[in-house]
Amino acid sequence: MPRRRLLKLLFIGKLRVSCKHYSTAGDPTKLVNLSEFTPDKIRNFGIVAHVDHGKSTLADRLLEMCGAVPPGQKQMLDKLQVERERGITVKAQTAALRHRGYLLNLIDTPGHVDFSAEVSRSLAVCDGILLLVAANQGVQAQTIANFWLAFEKNIQIIPVINKIDLPGADIKSVETQLKNLFEFNPEECLHISAKSGLNVDKVLEAIIDRVPAPTAIIDAPFRSMIFDSYFDHFRGAIAHIMVKEGSVKKGDKIQSYQNEKVYDVSEVGVMRPEMVKCTELRAGQVGYLVCNMRTVNEAVVGETLFAETTSRDSVKTFAEIKGVKPTVYAGLFPVETSDYESLKQAVERLCLNDPSVTVIPDSSKALGLGWRIGFLGVLHMEVFGARLSQEYDASVILCQPSVEYRAKIKDNETIRKKRYDGMEEIRILDPSKFPDESDVDSFLEPMVKVRMIVPNEMMGTVNGLCSECRGERGEITSIDSTRLVILWRLPLAEVAVDFFERLKKLTSGYASFDYEPDGWQDTRLVKLTILINSKEVSEFSQIIPAAMARDRAKILVQRLKREIPRQQFEVTIKACIGSSTKALSQIVIQPMKRDFSQLLKGNFGGGGMERLNKKLSHQKKGKERMKMVGNVQIPKEAFLNVLKR
């Protein structure tokens, strides 16, 4: 055989080998038929892990091996720009995979504590999970949190030890940790390298063998649950659904339980990992549905969709997905007040895709109309702001985050009944709602139970940080010979803003943590007020624990000094407590002065110095008059820079 033809055949053979798993099911002109997959041939599973344990990499390998994508693709399920920039998963994604005659519905989830709501929402449609642990890092705080989320929902858990080919991998140690913490036997654990693909085929076999089939009824009217949704500018709200009963296809009429509206289904399909149309979605399957939902309130997570022919009274709704309470609140305003309406629409549409965000209308004299928005953490807040910018081209001002406080009002005829409509306890979300201290019996601040995993030798350093954050020490448990699980009870105000960054810095990145709500505790709160030339600027006011007031006052005053330009008169910046004028921190911006010595050309003889002093005296008196009647010009950029974290 000629050498040239032989080389050509070898090249074609290699090409076939490299592409043998890749499917053309992503062709939008072809309809995928999933009718062969009855519930017993379906497995719905998720991947949960701590940050940077290889979750997205494992998802990529599974997609490759099942023919959903060509080899060599990275972060296929991390579709958002912010996810690729930061290297983290923010949004749970789904992908329908075929393997050995089974339909495997993969639900990828975030790993950061701020996005635990995404994990919880994804688990509502999973029958099993892969609990992924990196062999070089071991069990981390979020690993423990994710385990208990799945355990409480009675979901099958498959432990998978990843990164076994790294030099620092310690498989035996990780097996010991999994045994001590979760009672997994070593023979239950799979050992893989998601990066190289080593033993990933065993993961697919374990999913089929260990994960139970979904509980679903084919011979029944259509009923499904929305577990995620997002807004498309051309097709409206697109709902990701789990079909529990019956089937749905293009042309069917369906009804929404909450708003009682009837819709015509225009498209159904699955994610592979991009949208692929299919003939119908059947019981037990996970996919998407388009039915011309035009407002963000029509595709709410947890909503029940059912066949129009079914009586609404006979429909059993779903209760698997619970709302999540925000931990931090921040003001959100458009940079240009004229952009308010377009930003309002962007916020509503983004909240459809992120239902853990809460929105309350707000306003400011300096910044105009806006919102006070609740987030699950500071990273969640930063990602929300980045998505507004990247996906909706919105320019926004995100203010310094704060937590919710509460006040117990005195039981007094005048105070409680007349001033507070008889309420025994009020919520305080922003300084403008801060009550007069004479009206309050006590203030309450939210507490959290913090779980940290730290190396033995760093226990003292971490305990010192927690003591500094006004914490109460809890239990200490050894998970192996080198690491400890430490529990502390801390104020949420100390944890929500920069605790994780401080913890990583002190432990050189070796510590991990997660937290959960742990009730309320009496505290002393103050309203930190900023006065500029004796006038209060309400936009800079903050509610903080009294112990943090002096340090925060110094930071705010220094920031304002940098941001406010010099005026023709003296500007005094003071940080005070409440309505008091006694300064915790104060600074003076000196006025601009005219140099009269240049006008006199150095001619100080023959009465020149007397003339100079006279000019300076007149200037001083004039500036004092300006200070009494003048308004300090504060540029809008100052609000952005001072109120940011």
Swiss-Prot record:
PROSITE patterns: G_TR_1, G_TR_2. It is found in: Mitochondrion inner membrane. Residues 40-215 form the tr-type G domain. GO terms for molecular function: GTP binding; GTPase activity; mitochondrial ribosome binding. This protein may be expected to contain an N-terminal transit peptide but none has been predicted. The lineage of its organism: Eukaryota, Metazoa, Ecdysozoa, Nematoda, Chromadorea. It is a peripheral membrane protein. Gene3D superfamilies: 3.30.70.240, Elongation factor 4, C-terminal domain, Elongation Factor G (Translational Gtpase), domain 3, P-loop containing nucleotide triphosphate hydrolases, Translation factors. It comes from the Eukaryota. Its EC number is 3.6.5.-. GO terms for cellular component: mitochondrial inner membrane; mitochondrial matrix; mitochondrion. It comes from Caenorhabditis elegans. HAMAP family: LepA. Signal peptide: none annotated. Keywords: GTP-binding, Hydrolase, Membrane, Mitochondrion, Mitochondrion inner membrane, Nucleotide-binding, Protein biosynthesis. This is Translation factor GUF1 homolog, mitochondrial. Belongs to the TRAFAC class translation factor GTPase superfamily. Classic translation factor GTPase family. LepA subfamily.
